[in-house]
Amino acid sequence: MAIKTYRPLTPTLRFQTKLVNEELTTDRPHKPLTKTKQRTGGRRNAGDITIWHRGGGHKRKLRLIDFKRDKSGVPATVATVEYDPNRSANIALLHYADGEKRYILHPVGLKVGQKVVSGPDADILVGNALPLRNIPAGTVVHNIELKPGKGAQMARSAGAQAQLVAKESDYALLKLPSGETRRVLVDCMATIGQVGNLDYENVAIGKAGRTRWMGVRPTNRGVVMNPVDHPHGGGEGKTSGGRHPVTPWGQPTRGYKTRNNKRTDKFIVTRRGKR
């Protein structure tokens, strides 16, 4: 895996970099595990915008990823490593011994031809999935469930990893990529290793058009809008907004705490630090 730079033949090539991913083995997805992705353009059924800065972009097919890893005890061989346009991580196609095929997130070090397995009796090897109760303390894991059987919700993006710090009766203590330490039930599944595609964060997009290819539309500051569009809008000439920073809907922003989920507060041992 390497970052490719370009000679500045055009102004945007001067700053643009590209990820050269030698570990990818095919450019065609396994068709039965794909699904049409319906674009919304950030709009709901009434047609009005509900999410800003979305629209356009290249057509994509959804890859159906196995986040549950619930095929217990059946060994599988890694057949391909593939690009997935819907996430920062790459994906690996598994061929199970009983003939079934599934996609999983591709961890660092997992090669084509290697065997993986999931279940409580699996070995502590990269790509294997086990309940947290069977994973030794200090192990690096990814693709972690928050509720047993629901499917993984944490540590799924490129380069993400969490560390199993300790186990206390029914709960395991995990240090998450954000820096937060959290209790998770020991019956939740996790996959051994770190998510691959580590250089993803080092890619420089280089030009506005490339962002548009990704389906992201331009962002405007509130102070350059009219008062009808944003609380910071309006004023004669250039203004600073005249008040503390707020969202378009008037909620304080830039460091203002908005978390409101007291039900799960008891599971957070250490809050994440400031970036």
From Swiss-Prot:
Assigned keywords, A-Z: Ribonucleoprotein, Ribosomal protein, RNA-binding, rRNA-binding
GO biological process, one term: cytoplasmic translation
GO MF annotations in UniProt: rRNA binding; structural constituent of ribosome; transferase activity
PROSITE patterns associated with the record: RIBOSOMAL_L2
Entry keyword annotation includes Flavoprotein: no
Region (Disordered), start-end ranges: 24-48, 224-264
This protein's record includes keyword ATP-binding: no
Family: Belongs to the universal ribosomal protein uL2 family.
Function: One of the primary rRNA binding proteins. Required for association of the 30S and 50S subunits to form the 70S ribosome, for tRNA binding and peptide bond formation. It has been suggested to have peptidyltransferase activity; this is somewhat controversial. Makes several contacts with the 16S rRNA in the 70S ribosome.
Family annotation (PANTHER family): LARGE RIBOSOMAL SUBUNIT PROTEIN UL2M, RIBOSOMAL PROTEIN L2
Protein name per its UniProtKB record: Large ribosomal subunit protein uL2
Organism ancestry: Bacteria, Pseudomonadati, Acidobacteriota, Terriglobia, Terriglobales
Gene responsible for this protein: rplB
